[in-house]
């Protein structure tokens, strides 16, 4: 049953990421999505459906890895530092 919850959440998260990426240019959309997902993970401390599933499907490590492969090192640094800071901020809101 846990796998079903994660799979359902991942599908919903991926659809949400796709919809947002249609509204905003790709690199900026990806950064915003990853920052938002990190913040929500820290703030809500979600269960399997919403954490591992939805937020795992919503955020994108593969697109981040592709940008790294293409040499976007500043973008990668901003993403890593920004996502850690967003998670810490969300965690502070949860406390």
From Swiss-Prot:
Q: Name one Pfam family in it.
A: CRCB
TM regions (residue ranges):
23-43, 49-69, 70-90
Protein's cellular compartments: Cell membrane
User: Where does this protein chiefly localize?
Assistant: membrane
Matching entries from InterPro entries are given as: FluC (IPR003691)
Q: Name one GO molecular function term.
A: metal ion binding
The alphabetical list of record keywords is:
Cell membrane, Ion channel, Ion transport, Membrane, Metal-binding, Sodium, Transmembrane, Transmembrane helix, Transport
Record keywords: Secreted included?
no
Q: What does this protein do?
A: Fluoride-specific ion channel. Important for reducing fluoride concentration in the cell, thus reducing its toxicity.
Give the family, as the similarity comment puts it: Belongs to the fluoride channel Fluc/FEX (TC 1.A.43) family.
| Protein name from the UniProt record | Fluoride-specific ion channel FluC 1
Q: Which organism is it from?
A: Corynebacterium diphtheriae (strain ATCC 700971 / NCTC 13129 / Biotype gravis)
Which taxonomic lineage does the organism of this UniProt entry have?
Bacteria, Bacillati, Actinomycetota, Actinomycetes, Mycobacteriales
């Amino acid at each position: 049953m846990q796998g079903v919850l994660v799979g359902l959440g991942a599908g919903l998260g991926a659809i949400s990421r796709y919809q947002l990426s249609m509204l905003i240019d790709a690199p900026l959309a990806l950064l915003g999505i990853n920052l938002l997902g990190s913040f929500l993970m820290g703030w809500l401390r979600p269960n399997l459906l919403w954490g591992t599933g939805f937020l795992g499907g919503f955020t994108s490590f593969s697109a981040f890895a592709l940008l790294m492969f293409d040499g976007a090192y500043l973008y990668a640094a901003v993403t890593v530092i920004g996502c850690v800071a967003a998670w810490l901020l969300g965690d502070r809101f949860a406390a």
